[in-house]
Curated annotation (Swiss-Prot):
Swiss-Prot/TrEMBL keywords: Hydrolase, Magnesium
Pfam families associated with the record: 2-ph_phosp
Species of origin: Clostridium botulinum (strain 657 / Type Ba4)
Family per similarity comment: Belongs to the ComB family.
Protein name in UniProt: Probable 2-phosphosulfolactate phosphatase
NCBIfam families reported in the protein's UniProt record: PRK00886.1-1, PRK00886.1-4
Known catalytic reactions: (2R)-O-phospho-3-sulfolactate + H2O = (2R)-3-sulfolactate + phosphate
Superkingdom of origin organism: Bacteria
């Protein structure tokens, strides 16, 4: 199995994704939100690029819609929820459709439509994702959503942890240089939050008093669900 990493949504080459399994990572916080919502019984998540598109879906849909997302880490005016996974509890999302628009994560998803399979991962479900990847048994591209088009330490080390989870299942992994680097960084910094504390995105969220979000997102493997993007929306993967 060949594994490569793309360092941000702006670095996605759509032609490279053809016939590949793609993993989208945005641990702070879009993929943590999506994974949490699906785990809590959300019917589906619709990732969109713009606020206007999200509001149009909510206006025209007959489904029970929750609008969620952020711009520059802040809740979007008129939306039900921000980009905090702690808001997407079973009480609020079970049986409902979440329309989500974020600065980085939903852009990475929408830039990956050429892939054969698109899975959603974060620290909170990395082992479950690794098991799914093993069953799919296809070459893999891990896409880091990044921060405003730039490299993001938090997504990168999460990629390294995901690779480590895969190594615990199978040894026939062929890593690109960047994938080797991510794995090396994780194996030498297994206390991920301590390593990430100086990162730009981490500092931004902490400055907004979002410590509880950070604490939640840096937990490993508390969820055994893998979301999959397919045909315009995200649902629970069944393989």
């Amino acid at each position: 199995m060949n594994i490569d990493i793309v360092i941000s949504a702006d670095h996605i080459d759509e032609k490279r994704l053809i016939n590949k399994t793609v993993i989208i990572i945005d641990i702070l916080r879009a993929t943590s939100v999506i994974t949490t919502a699906i785990n809590n019984g959300c019917k589906k998540v619709i990732p969109v690029l713009t606020v206007e598109e999200a509001k149009d879906i909510a206006k025209n849909s007959k489904e029970d819609i929750i609008l969620g997302g952020e711009r520059n880490a802040l809740k979007i005016d008129g939306f039900n929820f921000s980009n905090s996974p702690l808001e997407y509890t079973k009480k609020y999302v079970e049986g409902k459709t979440v329309v989500l628009s974020t600065t980085n994560g939903t852009r990475a998803i929408n830039n990956s439509f050429n892939a054969k399979t698109i899975l959603i991962s974060a620290l909170i479900n990395s082992k479950a994702t690794a098991k799914a990847i093993d069953k799919l048994n296809e070459d893999l591209i891990i896409i880091n959503s990044g921060t405003n088009g730039q490299f993001s330490i938090d997504d990168f080390i999460c990629s390294g942890y995901l690779i480590d989870c895969l190594y615990n299942i199978r040894k026939d992994l062929e890593l690109s240089d960047i994938a080797k680097t991510a794995h090396y960084i994780y194996t030498n910094n297994k206390d991920i939050e301590s390593f990430v504390k100086k990162a730009t995105h981490y500092s931004r969220l902490k400055s907004l008093n979002l410590e509880k979000d950070l604490e939640y997102c840096f937990q490993k493997d508390i969820i055994d669900v893998v979301p999959q993007y397919k045909d315009g929306y995200i649902i629970k993967l069944n393989i």
